[in-house]
Amino acid sequence: MQKLKEIRTRFAPSPTGYLHIGGARTALFSWLYARHHQGKFVLRIEDTDQLRSTEESTRAILDAMTWLGLNWDEGPVFQAERVDIHRAMIRKLVDEDKAYYCTCTPDELEEKRKRALAEGRKPKYDGTCREKKLPPSPGTVVRFRCPQTGITVVDDLIKGKISFNNEELDDLIIQRSDGYPTYNFAVVVDDAQMGISHVIRGDDHVNNTPRQILLYQALGYDIPHFGHVPMILGADKARLSKRHGATSVMAYKDMGYLPEALVNYLVRLGWSHGDQEIFSLDELIALFGLESIGKSAAVFNPEKLLWLNQHYIKTYPEDRLLEVLQPFWKQLGIEAPDPDYGRSIVRDLRARAKTLVDMAESSTFYFNDEPAIDADAAKKFLTPEIAGHLEAIAEALATLGDYSKEGIEIFLRSLVEARAIKLKTIAQPLRIALTGKTVSPGLDDIMLTLGKERVIARIQRTVAYIRSGMAS
């Protein structure tokens, strides 16, 4: 068996649903630990639950991992393809009298469980078949012969030392009556044979760990290091679930979050480096360590994630932001714009946008030469006297030579001075003429991006709209 020298971590999801926030954080921590130590990150799909495992879920998990940028060095390895190996190792334990066949029925076990609870005892298999030396037969399970004395110590890299009395541990089932290995057995064989040196997983697995350590010892395997990550809670301090909002990684993609924002947020759910909030992936790889993961549960804060997403939208490479916007425009029926026009739109909108959905939805006026005018805004701002001011703007623009951002700013200031009005008098009417609404990027930015011809045409259309009486 391979000695545990190289750092090798793994992520081993069950393909029974989508990749959720908790699993993604576990994968991220395992990935970062491997990358920090120049080790290997292995992806294993634990698909031995034949009834619940689906190809669709497997694809969704792989897509989510890829979107987050968590590339794997080996795999995906499918656990179901290794069942013959698991069965061979179970036979080895039976042959060595470290496991035995059990014929106790589920009804009998349930009755014993109820009796133990009624008598104030912790439910535990009573060893009925432990010394019977039963042969294999249809419907039997295989149980591991757990030591009945001594203490098993888990030297957890996050939680510290945890001790378990062996007498409190069951003779756990390692092969079900259908012939398939149980989770606790298959995971030990797979981790050992794949040379996994560090098992980083959620703390709901803490109680599995002493049983797994005993299995490692019985099979003659090196025992890996374990690190159990505290769970993620909602704002109400209950375990994170759908009632707290989206929990699927790809749901956040669909809502317009950037993968860098989600990765940055997930790593801060339990891990910290001083007061630093924003980390590049290279920084995370350089700084990450299990010793900086807190022992208490982390609370999921959607507002903080939104703040991070807004930061990344502001700082994302322009061409990359234009690229990731395309699917959201497509959903709105908007064709991909000319690259130069698209970049200008991105520059206009990125400062205010919190998500890519926000960005796409607030950009529609750039693609519609007759943007729908908000009725309430029209009633408030598009008064008859405004028509004259807008008409003057359109006429003066036609002869404007310097149609740059600075030139537009000077033009607007000069025009309001000449007409003895304040800029705010025409700012909102002009904004409505160009966009149909009262909230948008700066006027000079919009005018520069739309171009002189579009701006003049939209102003003239709005003047006609006012004089037709439609604004009142």
Swiss-Prot record:
GO cellular component: a single term: cytosol
SUPFAM superfamilies xrefs: An anticodon-binding domain of class I aminoacyl-tRNA synthetases, Nucleotidylyl transferase
Protein EC: 6.1.1.17
Cofactor entry: Zn(2+)
An annotated GO BP: glutamyl-tRNA aminoacylation
Cofactor: record remark: Binds 1 zinc ion per subunit.
UniProt main location, coarse: cytoplasm
Extent of motif 'KMSKS' region: 239-243
Positions contributing to ATP binding: K242
UniProt keywords, alphabetically: Aminoacyl-tRNA synthetase, ATP-binding, Cytoplasm, Ligase, Metal-binding, Nucleotide-binding, Protein biosynthesis, Zinc
Record localization: Cytoplasm
HAMAP family with a match to the protein in the record: Glu_tRNA_synth_type1
Subunit structure: Monomer.
Homology family: Belongs to the class-I aminoacyl-tRNA synthetase family. Glutamate--tRNA ligase type 1 subfamily.
Full protein name: Glutamate--tRNA ligase 1
Organism: Syntrophus aciditrophicus (strain SB)
Gene: gltX1
